[in-house]
């Protein structure tokens, strides 16, 4: 009898065969599934705590996606030769998996749940993110935890005007769209994408196509659960304290309603804190008088939050003004200023209502490109975008340090939005870093980073293909009534049912991110949201174009200038020198940065035009070929009995034979030449071994022939 109750399911999905198995590996986890997609293998495990911690008032879900270097047949770098902190790619995929899973746990479930996905084997052509998401969903489904799944996922490309399901990496490179969609049988929950200025109907079509195709994976997970799933947990949400809800409503409803008539965020936050504190104090006073125990702060806070949500949502659905007084379609007032920081290469201050981003663009050389050591192989990235949001942006105190998952995710979204409109490396050879410093935040700071990033790049002289703007949309849905909100506030994000971010140009969408908290979102609602987002985006683009009509034609005085020359690839070693001695001396003496590609393209960068010109001249001398018939001003390096060794160019010497020095016979060469002497010589012969023969006599004879003869 086998130790294992192994269950295997296989299905064809697009161009790939997918194999899912459970029951053999990691049997002590609550759920574990191994997913194999054409040799890309991931192990997804789930462990759920049987009870919640006392006083727990939120759902502690953690998702960790971990890439093992052995999966690609590699040994990790570094002193310890083992995997360390998560890479940016691992963090982004962890977020990608977390986002569709989190809304499917029932309200009131506060038991700790940990999802860990290990990449065990990697096929460079098959990305591991979709197998990881499918595996995490399957592991949750077989675990028996209270989970309203399973979740399916699919990647969609758009190649030759057709949608392609789960494309290979090679296909993605030739696609105008890279979109990941996740959802249940009935609804889309999450979309993450970047596109090459595609129209809204193509984007929506990709979402619908992906949702239809993921049903195959969902059906396979159902089959896996039927044969290998564990018993469902006997869990029920704690009954609601109706007496507490009723009393809190009596005490706080009108006060909360009044607070939400305050348009200013800071003033509103102050009033809300006062209502929370007063409500808690009133309940404690009543409990003391009755000789009972007062409800804890967390329970009271949850009830108050529900009342806030009810007030805000009902006001919007009833056609009343939003929290800050706007209607559903109005974008907040926008202010734009460029050239904000004097010594940076490009900068912009983008303010939309109470959200503000100070964005800075920096230009660098090829040596400044980010080198990414991915499982699929090392590659270089010439465009970096980093998003920072310090605590002061929301008027709070907090930890300042390395970026958190949210900051990494927001930076990647803004990067995707701008990437489609950047010039190619051939058109603009600089590496580019954009940093978005969020100085104020009240919703949609990632989209402010897109707008500010585009303006900062233009200020830096980067020839963008078009202006790029981004906008965040929200949704309130109750039964058959819904309202799509343009340019949402932070509170509307927390209290709403959808966070929907769209970035693009006047011609189309470049990035789309959607997170949906409920399962009633239809294609029609998404269509309305996309159309309303386009209207808002066009408004912002109009403001941006009015402020900055085009790219700054001159680079900042503090940005490096670049020139490019082509040399024979066989001469690269001469420019570099033994142990890098030649190129090191070149860069130090001329104050330049020099990059040499394998095909012989040399890029020289410096803030000094004189330094660049000197470096260019010296490289041309180093790589120049000695040509027969050419005349050179050489330096005598060494005297021999039969002639002299003369240096013509760096690394290029020739022999000046004693018979080629003068027309008369020479007895002692020292009478004519000295070491270190400058001498003009002509190349009269070279051979296949690179040996060069020189003549000074030939120049003397040529000079004599050109002298005018005396008139008779």
UniProtKB/Swiss-Prot annotation:
GO terms assigned for molecular function: 3'-5'-RNA exonuclease activity; magnesium ion binding; polyribonucleotide nucleotidyltransferase activity; RNA binding
Domain of life: Bacteria
NCBIfam families: polynuc_phos, PRK11824.1
Organism: Paraburkholderia phymatum (strain DSM 17167 / CIP 108236 / LMG 21445 / STM815)
InterPro entries: ExoRNase_PH_dom1, ExoRNase_PH_dom2, ExoRNase_PH_dom2_sf, KH_dom, KH_dom_type_1, KH_dom_type_1_sf, NA-bd_OB-fold, PNPase
UniProt-listed Enzyme Commission number(s): 2.7.7.8
Protein name: Polyribonucleotide nucleotidyltransferase
Domain S1 motif: 629-697
Transmembrane segments: none
Keywords assigned: Cytoplasm, Magnesium, Metal-binding, Nucleotidyltransferase, RNA-binding, Transferase
One Gene Ontology cellular component annotation held by this UniProt entry: cytosol
Enzyme class, first EC level, given as a word: transferase
Cofactor(s) annotated in UniProt: Mg(2+)
PROSITE patterns the UniProt entry points to: KH_TYPE_1, S1
């Amino acid at each position: 009898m086998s130790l294992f109750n192994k269950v295997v399911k296989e299905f064809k999905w697009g161009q790939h065969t997918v194999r899912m198995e459970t029951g053999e590996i990691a049997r002590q986890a609550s759920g574990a599934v191994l997913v194999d997609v054409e040799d890309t293998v991931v192990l997804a495990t789930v462990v759920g705590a049987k009870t919640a911690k006392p006083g727990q008032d939120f759902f502690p879900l953690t998702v960790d996606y971990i890439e093992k270097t052995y999966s690609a047949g590699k040994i990790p770098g570094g002193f310890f030769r083992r995997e360390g902190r998560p890479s940016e790619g691992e963090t982004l995929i962890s977020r990608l998996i977390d986002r569709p899973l989190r809304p499917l746990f029932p309200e009131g479930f506060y038991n700790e749940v940990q999802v860990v996905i290990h990449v065990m084997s990697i096929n460079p052509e098959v990305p591991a993110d979709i197998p990881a998401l499918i595996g995490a969903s399957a592991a949750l489904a077989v675990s028996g935890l209270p989970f309203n799944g399973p979740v399916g996922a699919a990647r969609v490309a758009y190649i030759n005007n057709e949608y392609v399901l789960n494309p290979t990496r090679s296909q993605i490179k030739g696609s105008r769209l890279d979109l990941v969609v996740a959802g249940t049988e009935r609804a889309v929950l999450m979309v993450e994408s970047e596109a090459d200025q595609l129209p809204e109907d193509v984007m929506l079509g990709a979402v619908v196509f992906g949702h239809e195709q993921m049903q195959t994976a969902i059906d396979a997970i159902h089959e896996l659960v039927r044969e290998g799933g564990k018993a469902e947990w006997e869990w029920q949400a704690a009954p609601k304290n109706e007496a507490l809800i009723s009393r809190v409503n009596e005490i706080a409803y009108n006060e909360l309603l009044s607070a939400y008539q305050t348009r200013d965020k800071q003033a509103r936050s102050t009033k809300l804190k006062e209502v929370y504190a007063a409500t808690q104090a009133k309940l404690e006073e009543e409990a003391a008088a009755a000789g009972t125990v007062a409800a804890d702060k967390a329970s009271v806070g949850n009830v108050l939050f529900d009342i806030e949500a009810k007030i805000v949502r009902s006001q919007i659905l009833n056609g009343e003004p939003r929290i800050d007084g706007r209607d559903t379609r109005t974008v907040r007032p926008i202010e734009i200023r460029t050239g904000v920081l004097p010594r940076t290469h490009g900068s912009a201050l983008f303010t939309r209502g109470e959200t503000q981003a100070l964005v800075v663009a920096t230009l660098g050389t090829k040596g400044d490109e980010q080198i990414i050591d991915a499982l699929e192989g090392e590659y270089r990235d010439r465009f970096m975008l980093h998003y920072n949001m310090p605590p002061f942006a929301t008027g709070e105190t907090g930890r300042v340090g390395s970026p958190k998952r949210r900051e990494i995710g927001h930076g990647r979204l803004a990067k995707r939005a701008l990437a489609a409109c950047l010039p190619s490396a051939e058109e603009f050879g600089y590496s580019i870093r954009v940093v978005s410093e969020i100085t104020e935040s009240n919703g949609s700071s990632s989209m402010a980073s897109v707008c500010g990033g585009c303006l900062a790049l233009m200020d830096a002289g980067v020839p963008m293909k078009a202006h790029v703007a981004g906008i965040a949309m929200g949704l309130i849905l109750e039964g058959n009534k819904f309202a799509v909100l343009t340019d949402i506030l932070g509170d509307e994000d927390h209290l709403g049912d959808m966070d929907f971010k769209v970035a693009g140009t006047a011609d189309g969408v470049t990035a789309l991110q959607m997170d949906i908290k409920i399962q009633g979102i239809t294609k029609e609602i998404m269509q309305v949201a996309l159309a309303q987002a386009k209207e808002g985006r066009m408004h912002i683009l109009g403001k941006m174009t009015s402020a900055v009509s085009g790219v700054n034609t001159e680079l900042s005085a503090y940005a490096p200038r670049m020139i490019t020359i082509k040399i024979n690839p066989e001469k690269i070693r001469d420019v570099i020198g033994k142990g890098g001695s030649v190129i090191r001396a070149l860069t130090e003496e001329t104050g330049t940065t020099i990059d040499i590609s394998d095909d012989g393209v040399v890029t020289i960068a410096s803030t000094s035009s004189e330094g660049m010109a000197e470096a260019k001249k010296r490289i041309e001398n180093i790589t120049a070929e000695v040509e027969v018939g050419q005349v050179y001003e050489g330096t005598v390096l060494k005297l021999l009995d039969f002639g002299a060794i003369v240096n013509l160019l760096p690394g290029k010497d020739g022999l000046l034979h004693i018979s080629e020095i003068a027309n008369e016979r020479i007895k002692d060469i020292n009478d004519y030449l000295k070491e270190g002497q400058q001498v003009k010589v002509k190349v009269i012969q070279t051979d296949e071994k690179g040996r060069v023969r020189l003549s000074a006599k030939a120049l003397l004879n040529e000079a004599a022939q050109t002298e005018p003869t005396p008139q008779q």
